[in-house]
């Protein structure tokens, strides 16, 4: 990148000066194969001017708020630039941490006892206990299990009949019709 003739401390340079340098560099950019700078119509147009076209160098950052705000900006960041010009250079647009103050909760917060006290019993602790016995017998031959198995068998037979039995039965029926004719 090329250096501008204006010497400022990099950390204290206003945004307009950076925009001015960027526009200067973009206007004079030369690609590797070209000998002439780019000639874009936007730079020669009477209607449009690049952002920061009429910016004069300032002696210090304290003179930043004296700038004339009547010039028109043609930039997608117009609102951000305008607000930065009105407030002057700042550390952050959101203020500093010291200006925010502390936030105190109106309700006192208590720590969750269940997280640090293993003697407190939860309702679902029996689910994690391997030797828990609730008195039910563990018979796998129940009416519900039998109905579930019967339903699975009927669904399987129905699918087999649909995709295997129906084509076979329709082929047999077609052969019977041919023999009759």
Curated annotation (Swiss-Prot):
GO BP terms: mitotic division septum assembly
UniProt KW Cytoplasm keyword: yes
Biased composition (Acidic residues): 32-47
Membrane topology: Single-pass membrane protein
Transmembrane residue ranges: 149-169
Keywords: Cytoplasm, Membrane, Transmembrane, Transmembrane helix
Annotated segments matching region Disordered: 25-47
Subcellular location field: Cytoplasm; Membrane
GO CC terms of this entry: cell cortex of cell tip; cell division site; cytoplasm; division septum; plasma membrane
Protein name: Uncharacterized protein P22H7.03
Originating species: Schizosaccharomyces pombe (strain 972 / ATCC 24843) (Fission yeast)
């Amino acid at each position: 990148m090329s250096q501008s003739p204006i010497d400022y401390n990099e950390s204290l340079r206003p945004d307009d000066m950076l925009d001015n340098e960027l526009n200067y560099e973009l206007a004079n950019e030369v690609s590797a194969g070209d000998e002439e700078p780019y000639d874009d119509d936007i730079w020669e147009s009477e209607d449009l001017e690049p952002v920061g076209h009429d910016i004069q160098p300032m002696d210090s950052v304290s003179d930043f708020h004296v700038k004339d705000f009547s010039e028109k900006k043609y930039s997608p960041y117009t609102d951000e630039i305008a607000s930065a010009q009105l407030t002057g250079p700042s550390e952050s647009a959101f203020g500093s941490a010291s200006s925010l103050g502390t936030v105190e909760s109106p309700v006192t917060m208590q720590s969750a006892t269940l997280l640090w006290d293993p003697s407190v019993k939860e309702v679902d602790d029996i689910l994690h206990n391997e030797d828990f016995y609730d008195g039910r017998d563990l018979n796998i031959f129940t009416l519900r299990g039998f109905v579930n198995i019967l339903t699975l068998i009927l669904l399987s037979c129905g699918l087999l009949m649909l995709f295997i039995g129906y084509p076979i039965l329709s082929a047999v029926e077609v052969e019977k019709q041919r023999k009759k004719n």
